[in-house]
Amino acid sequence: MDAMIGDPMSATSVEAVFEKQPSPEFRELVTPRAMAVAVVLSVVICFVGMRIQMTAGIVPALNMPASILSFFLLKWLIRLLQSCGFPMLPFTRQENMFLLTCIITCLNLALTSGFATNIIGMTSTVARSLADDPDPRDIMDHVPIGKWIVYLFLVGMTGVLINVPFNQVMIIDYKLLFPTGTVIAQLINSFHTPEGAYVAKMQVATIFKVFFGSFSWSMFQWFYTAGDDCGFQHFPTFGLGLYKHRFYFDFSATYIGLGMICPHIVNFGLFFGAIISWGFLYPFLETKRGQWYQTDSPTSLNGQNGYKVFISVTLIITDGMINFLTLITTASINFYQLRKEHDLGLANYFKKHPSLNYDDRKRIEVFLANRIPIPVPVAAYITCAAISTIAIPAMFNQIKFYHLAVLYMVIPVVTFCNTYATGLTDWSVAPTYAKFTTFVFAAWIAKPGAVVASLLASGVIVAALHISSQAMQDLKSGHMTLTSPRAMVTGQIFGVAVGSILCPCVFLAFQSTTKPNAPVGSKQSDYPCPFAGLYRAIGVIGTGGVKELPKHCMTFCVVAFCVTVIIDAVVLVSQKRGWSIHRYIPSMTVIALPFFAGSYFTIDMCVGSLLLLAWTRMNAKSAEMLSSAVAAGLICGEGLFTLPSALLNMFKVQPPMCMKFLSGGEEVEAADSFLNNLGTSRT
C-alpha cells in the first residue's frame, strides 16, 4: 500500500473494508453482461418514466429503483451463468456503478427527450389547443424516427462531453456533495461489503431497517391519495393560510434524508430563500394582480409565473457566472503554479491537503490516476457542437446554424451553473433554463417558425444540462466506489447510444395505442402530456419579446442581479482576508431554488438537519457512523416505492381514499351536504 494514502485502520473507514480487494481493470468493469442488463433495465425504466411523464407530467426520482434492480438482476444473471458452467469474473461495486450509470443516463435522456414536452408542443394537436388558427409554419407533426435518433444522440453526447472538464473541479476541488450520488454510493458500497467488517455490517443493517420503514410509510401514504392535493403530502401543518403559500411539512422521507446529508448552511439557506419568496415577495405580487399583470394562470409567463422564472434564473445564472469567472481568473493568475502542481501529481496534492482521511486519499488517488485529459473532452465537445450546428438545421429548417452556434457557446457556462447548483442541493433546474431559452429564442427569431425553433433550442438545453448534472451525480458515486472516471464516461456514452434509439421507439409504442380522436397531447388522450402546452405557450408569448412579460419583471431581475453580485463579493473578500463571515452566508443558488420550486421541501430538509444536530449532540460517534446510512435508507425506501406506485397507476389501480383538509365554515358545510347526499343516494 502507498504510504501517502494514510492509515486505513479507522472505525468508520469504508475503503479499509475493501482493502483486500484488488482494483478491477477497465475490461473488468465494461463487460458484455453489464451492457446486456443495462439494455434490459433501460427498456423497463424508460417505459415507466416516459409513461409517467406523458400522463402526470412530473416524474419522481427513479435512481433508487434502478440502483437496487441493477444490483439484483446482474447478480442473478451471474449466478445463473455460473450454474450453467460458465466461468465468471467477480461482481464488483465498480462494475455495478458502470451498469447503473448506463441505465441512469438512458433514463435521463428519455425524460429530457421532449416526447412529453417540447416535441409534442410542436404538434398541431397542442397548437390548436392554444389557438383556433395556428400558423402551419409553427407546426411540425410527422418527423421520421431516424431524425429523432440523430437529434437525441447529438444532444445526449453534448450533455456527457461538456460535463467531463468540470469533473475534478466539482468533485475534488469544490468537494460538492451531490446528495443523490453520495447516497447511491453508500448503497452500492453496502451491497458489496465483504463479510466480517463490523462497522460496515452495522451500516448495512441500518440501511435496510430504515429502508423497510421508509418503504412501508410510503405505501401507507399511498392509500390516502385518491384525488388531487390529497394525502399526507398536503398536510397543512402550519394552517391553511400558510399552506396556500406552500409552507407545510409533507412527511417526505426523501427530503428528510437529504436534509441529513446536506450541509446545515444549505438546508437553512433553502429555508431562508423560501421565506423571502413565498413568505414576502409572492404575497406582495398577488396584491398587484390586475395592475401589473392580468392572468390568473399559474403557468403563464405574462402572469406571476413570469416573476418566478426570471428572478430565479437571474439569481442562479449570476451566482454561477461569478463562480465560473472566479475559477477561470484564479486558474489564469496561478497558471504557472497549477502547471507545476500538475507535473508533480498526486504526491504534491496530498502534501497540500494533509488533513485528508484515508477514504478521501484513496478515492482521489484512483480518480486522478484514471482521469481523462481535459483536451480530449474539449475537442470532442467542439466536434459534437460543429456536427450539431450543421446536422440539426439540415433536419429542421426552422432553426439556423447561427442559433445553434450561439447555443453551444452558452452551454458550457450554464452547465457549470446548473451542475454547481445540483452539487449543493440535489436540484437540477434544467427545466427552468429550458423555459428561459424558449422565451429568449422565440423573441430573438420573432417570425413564422420561431415557436418550433425555440422549442428545438430548449430541447438541446434541457437535455444537455440535465444529463450533465446527473452524470456528475454518477461520477460522484463512482468516486466514492473507486470506479474509474473513464469507465463511468464510457457507460454514459453507451447509455446515450441506447437511449437515442430506445426513446423514439417507446414513444411510437405509446402513440400506436392512442385512439384516433384522442392523439398524444390532447386533453382527452391517455397521454395528455400536460407540460407540452406550457412550453408552446412560452414560445408563443416569446415572439412578442420582453414587452409580453408582466410589469416590473425586468426591474426585479436587475435587483436580483445586483444583490447576488454584492453578496458574492462579500463572500470572496471574506475568504481572501480570512474572515469567518463567509461560513454563515449560503450560496445565492441555494437561496434561489425555492423561488421557483416551492417552499415545502425546505421544511423537510430543515427537519433532517435538526434531527442530525440533535443526534450528534446526544451521541456524536453514532451519528458520524450511521447518519449517512439512515439518510440512504430514508431516500431509497421512498424512492423504490415509486416503481410499484407507477405500475399501479399504469394499470389504473387507484388509491381507495382521499384525505383532504378544508377551512371551516361554508366549505365544510358544502362537503358535509355532499357526503350526506351521497350516502342517501346509495341507500
UniProtKB/Swiss-Prot annotation:
Gene Ontology terms, MF aspect: oligopeptide transmembrane transporter activity
Keywords: Membrane, Transmembrane, Transmembrane helix, Transport
Gene Ontology CC entries for this record: membrane
InterPro entries cross-referenced by the UniProt entry: OPT, YSL-like
Signal peptide: none
UniProt entry tagged with the keyword Signal: no
Thylakoid recorded as keyword: no
Primary site of residence: membrane
Cell compartment(s), UniProt: Membrane
Transmembrane annotation, as ranges: 29-49, 58-78, 97-117, 142-162, 204-224, 265-285, 309-329, 372-392, 404-424, 448-468, 490-510, 553-573, 595-615, 628-648
Membrane topology: Multi-pass membrane protein
Family: Belongs to the YSL (TC 2.A.67.2) family.
Function of the molecule: May be involved in the transport of nicotianamine-chelated metals.
Classification via PANTHER family: METAL-NICOTIANAMINE TRANSPORTER YSL4-RELATED (PTHR31645:SF9), OLIGOPEPTIDE TRANSPORTER YGL114W-RELATED (PTHR31645)
Record's protein name: Probable metal-nicotianamine transporter YSL3
Lineage summary: Eukaryota, Viridiplantae, Streptophyta, Embryophyta, Tracheophyta
Gene encoding the protein: YSL3
